[in-house]
From Swiss-Prot:
PANTHER family: LARGE RIBOSOMAL SUBUNIT PROTEIN BL17M, RIBOSOMAL PROTEIN L17. It comes from Exiguobacterium sibiricum (strain DSM 17290 / CCUG 55495 / CIP 109462 / JCM 13490 / 255-15). Keywords: Ribonucleoprotein, Ribosomal protein. Part of the 50S ribosomal subunit. Contacts protein L32. One of its GO terms (cellular component) is cytosolic large ribosomal subunit. The gene is rplQ. This is Large ribosomal subunit protein bL17. Pfam families: Ribosomal_L17. One of its GO terms (biological process) is translation. The keyword Acetylation does not apply.
Length: 123
């Protein structure tokens, strides 16, 4: 399977994708470079598919990848983390959709180094 190294070692790349995936689940839209977004898309798609499954094994698989960060409050006023948000809010939204949960929109080049910037968001 082809992938981009993103100028990092494998552990740094995995940490970067974990952070970006967690941020995308929490904020539902982030701005990043085009290459990072293209690498992030299949990771997030798999996480949402696990969220749709919703069983204990899927929860544990997601918990092993997504960071435990606060994702705001739910309807009851309790603080929820990124994993709870994925299973309670994000995955049910895509119950009828078979893949294609993310959208990448180009923003133009970054001012400092000219890297192509994009917004990746949940549909």
């Amino acid at each position: 399977m082809a992938y981009s190294k993103l100028g990092r070692t494998s552990s740094q790349r995995k940490a970067l994708l974990r952070d970006l995936a967690t941020d995308l689940i929490i904020n539902e839209r982030i701005q990043t470079t085009e290459q990072k977004a293209k690498e992030l898309r299949p990771v997030v798609e798999k996480l949402i598919t696990l969220g749709k499954r919703g069983d204990l094994h899927a929860r544990r698989q997601v918990a092993s990848f997504v960071r435990r960060e606060a994702a705001g409050q739910n309807e009851a006023g309790k603080t929820q983390d990124a994993i709870q948000k994925l299973f309670a809010d994000v995955a049910p939204r895509f119950a009828e959709r078979q893949g294609g949960y993310t959208r990448i929109m180009k923003m133009g080049p970054r001012r400092g180094d000219g890297a192509e910037m994009v917004i990746i968001e949940l549909v």
